[in-house]
Amino acid sequence: MSTIEERVKKIIVEQLGVKQEEVVNNASFVDDLGADSLDTVELVMALEEEFDTEIPDEEAEKITTVQAAIDFIQANQQ
């Protein structure tokens, strides 16, 4: 099974249509990877589905980088 980091990065590549090498931990979804607000909502939904978790809106707003997504998932896995 892949690590959480690998799974998060795979989802980001698929959702945003970016190259794997562009998805570095400190990359901002909007500033570095070209995501818009709809992309970020869809990305959060894909993360919720992949990791069978719920990301509250107030937390989703804080997930603006690849590392923030990884950190949230790691902190909220059962």
Curated annotation (Swiss-Prot):
<dbReference type="GO" id="GO:0000035">
    <property type="term" value="F:acyl binding"/>
</dbReference>
<keyword id="KW-0443">Lipid metabolism</keyword>
<feature type="domain" description="Carrier">
    <location>
        <begin position="2"/>
        <end position="77"/>
    </location>
</feature>
<dbReference type="InterPro" id="IPR006162">
    <property type="entry name" value="Ppantetheine_attach_site"/>
</dbReference>
<dbReference type="GO" id="GO:0005829">
    <property type="term" value="C:cytosol"/>
</dbReference>
<dbReference type="InterPro" id="IPR036736">
    <property type="entry name" value="ACP-like_sf"/>
</dbReference>
<keyword id="KW-0963">Cytoplasm</keyword>
<keyword id="KW-0597">Phosphoprotein</keyword>
<dbReference type="InterPro" id="IPR009081">
    <property type="entry name" value="PP-bd_ACP"/>
</dbReference>
<dbReference type="Pfam" id="PF00550">
    <property type="entry name" value="PP-binding"/>
</dbReference>
<protein>
    <recommendedName>
        <fullName>Acyl carrier protein</fullName>
    </recommendedName>
</protein>
<dbReference type="GO" id="GO:0009245">
    <property type="term" value="P:lipid A biosynthetic process"/>
</dbReference>
<keyword id="KW-0275">Fatty acid biosynthesis</keyword>
<keyword id="KW-0596">Phosphopantetheine</keyword>
<comment type="pathway">
    <text>Lipid metabolism; fatty acid biosynthesis.</text>
</comment>
<dbReference type="GO" id="GO:0000036">
    <property type="term" value="F:acyl carrier activity"/>
</dbReference>
<dbReference type="GO" id="GO:0016020">
    <property type="term" value="C:membrane"/>
</dbReference>
<keyword id="KW-0444">Lipid biosynthesis</keyword>
<comment type="similarity">
    <text>Belongs to the acyl carrier protein (ACP) family.</text>
</comment>
<comment type="function">
    <text>Carrier of the growing fatty acid chain in fatty acid biosynthesis.</text>
</comment>
<keyword id="KW-0276">Fatty acid metabolism</keyword>
<feature type="modified residue" description="O-(pantetheine 4'-phosphoryl)serine">
    <location>
        <position position="37"/>
    </location>
</feature>
<dbReference type="InterPro" id="IPR003231">
    <property type="entry name" value="ACP"/>
</dbReference>
